[in-house]
Design a protein with these regions (language model features):
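Domain-level signal for soluble alpha/beta catalytic cores
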Residues: 1-594
Length: 594
């Protein structure tokens, strides 16, 4: 069998092309099932790619990590058959065989690391020494699995390949250059690259962003972009164009080339011919595209961040956006809060999954008209990656430099036939994506500061703290907490300060309770809020005015209890009672923050 490491010292390595899009599966059947139901058909595909000139072929096992994660019976037999068919075909020409592993889902009960390792070890027992982890959107668990694999098979050659959109980001919002850098610095990955999603021309542009990764670079684009014709998905990229673009990459230093979706033996044959026509001496690695002179970053003066970083206690006030299309009263309320001394206005993103005026659009209007710092909430519930990026670019252009990234309340079950959740990622991955948009040559010259939520009322606060630490690792700068309405919430706030450190900016949540009915409702129907029973009883029999007075006093005392462990306060306006918030801000300014 071909020695991949030796070949790469002499010339580029040519892989095969797509399996699933070339081999026509039966309706409802996984392509991998054909390893058992149609072995001759799969063997014929392998042989066609080898006849086209491929130096290496992939086992027909892309979906195995997903099947293994689901504990689907028989995945081991699919692995065995997939390996045996590829090895049989490669044995006829001396080509290399790569055990092919697609993305594994990462869950608490079945971490991706364990899934990858189980599948890779199965292949290793069959004799595999070359492994391809492909079409990944993130590195979750893959490096840990490779480290463990190499303890068992130290001679293993491992190629890790990411699926990257033409804008340089994966579907999980990870920036390609950062992913490649992490693989190159791991010490356990032998080659790294890009595959799928993008067509040859776009992938060539992506490679120019990467420069010299320090490892052999792999490129396996799709034939083109998919179109639907007669209820079938087709790729229209021509073999000649595919070969021309990839041979250019080879002449620029890419060492491993092949095809993904829509590519056929004709594409690989054309690329084989083009590669054979190249001079024997080629660059060892691609050169980075020379960047244009960077424009000087003129960063706006952010009074909220400046005050927060200087150690002064800040006050953020949440005011829910209107349920209708009239913003007049809202803007007047925002003006009053600003005049009262609020440092920041926060705007929820359709709380409890009920549609309101868009939080980001409202934030832009407030910032533009009042010059006030704003913090729009951004959930993962309603937008995919494209919509999220488009919104972030618009926010940046409008001068908004802070967002609150949250996963978001799910759509009520009864409405899910008409309104769908999106949840392409969670708040941690959203934060990581937002931070990754800033930097030299990227979409934003300076970063957007990302805050997250911290639930002081979580039943298992240790788990909540672990998640908070992960949020910080993924780029968040601080947290807005759920309301402090119990002694346990204060104790958890203290624990958060001790655990997360002074670098994590924490704004303690203060929500005035205004009636016993209001308190009982929040205790029983609002996720993340716990109202102490003693507080609920205090409101019994009070009218509106008396209830508001008591709510004000309870809020001030809660703020005083939270103050030693907080960098400021996050005030939530009940029922749009701006006058109450004006009084609360005044009390906090005189009794707590100053």
């Amino acid at each position: 069998m071909l020695d991949v490491r030796k070949l790469l010292t002499r010339r580029p390595l040519l892989f095969d092309g797509g399996m699933g899009t070339y081999y026509k599966t039966k309706p409802g059947q996984e392509c991998e099932q054909a390893n058992l139901t149609d072995p001759e058909g799969i063997l014929a595909v392998h042989r066609a790619y080898l006849a086209a000139g491929a130096d290496a072929i992939k086992t027909n096992t892309f979906s195995l990590p997903r099947l293994a994660a689901a504990q689907q019976p028989g995945w081991e037999q699919l692995a065995d058959a997939g390996w045996q068919l590829a090895a049989k075909a490669a044995g006829e020409t001396g080509a290399a065989v790569f055990a092919d592993l697609g993305p594994a889902p990462d869950t608490e009960n079945n971490p991706a690391e364990q899934v990858y390792l189980a599948v890779a070890k199965r292949f290793a027992l069959l004799g595999a020494r070359n492994f391809l982890f492909e079409t990944l959107s993130a590195e979750d668990g893959v490096l840990e699995a490779i480290r463990a694999l190499k303890q068992t098979v130290p001679e293993a050659f491992v190629l890790v390949s990411f699926a990257v959109l033409p804008d340089g980001y994966t579907r999980e919002g990870r920036y390609c250059a950062e992913l490649v850098r992490r693989m190159a610095q791991s010490g356990v990955v032998d080659a790294v690259g890009l595959n799928c999603v993008s067509a040859p021309g776009a992938m060539r542009a992506l490679v120019q962003q990467l420069g010299d990764a320090g490892l052999p670079l792999s490129v396996m684009p799709n034939a083109g972009y998919p179109v639907v014709a007669r209820a079938q998905v087709r790729y229209q990229g021509k073999p000649e164009y595919f070969a021309r673009e990839l041979s250019r990459l080879a002449s620029e230093g890419v060492r491993i080339l092949g095809g993904c979706c829509g590519t056929t033996p004709q594409h690989i044959a054309a690329l084989r011919t083009a590669l054979d026509a190249l001079p024997e001496t080629l660059p060892a690695a691609p050169a980075a595209k020379s960047a244009e002179a960077a424009k000087p970053v003129v960063e706006m003066d952010d009074a909220f961040l400046r005050k927060l970083r200087a150690g002064q206690r800040v006050i953020a006030v949440e005011l829910d956006s209107p349920k209708d299309a009239d913003l007049t009263a809202y803007l007047e309320g925002a003006r009053r809060l600003q005049a009262a001394g609020a440092d920041l206005l926060t705007i929820a993103d359709c709380p409890i999954a009920r549609a309101r005026m868009d939080s980001s659009l409202v934030a832009c209007r407030v910032h533009r008209e009042l010059g006030m710092n704003v913090l729009p909430h951004m959930t993962c519930r309603d937008r995919n990656l494209n919509a999220t990026k488009a919104l972030l670019l618009g926010l940046y252009a409008e001068g908004v430099r802070e967002v609150l990234a949250i996963t978001g309340d799910p759509i009520p079950t009864a409405e899910r036939d008409e309104v769908k959740n999106v949840y392409q990622f969670n708040s941690r991955k959203l934060a990581q994506y937002i931070v990754s948009l800033a930097g030299e040559g990227r979409e934003m010259p300076s970063p957007i500061t990302v805050f997250g939520a911290l639930n002081l009322n979580a039943r298992n606060f240790e788990v909540e703290l672990r998640r908070a630490a992960e949020k910080l690792e993924n780029g968040m700068s601080g947290f807005l907490t759920q309301p402090v309405l119990s002694a346990q919430a204060v104790e958890n706030l203290k624990k958060a300060r001790e655990t997360l450190g002074e670098q994590a900016k924490i704004l303690a949540g203060i929500l005035p309770v205004v009636s016993q009915r209001n308190a009982i409702f929040m205790e029983n129907e609002v996720n993340g809020i716990h109202v102490d029973e003693a507080i609920i009883q205090k409101f019994e029999g009070l009218d509106r005015a008396a209830g508001e007075e008591l709510g004000l006093e309870v809020s001030v005392q809660a703020a005083k209890a939270a103050a030693p462990y907080a960098d400021g306060f996050y005030l939530m306006t009940p029922f749009n009672r701006v006058a109450l918030m004006e009084r609360l801000i005044a009390r906090l300014r005189t009794e707590v923050t100053d």
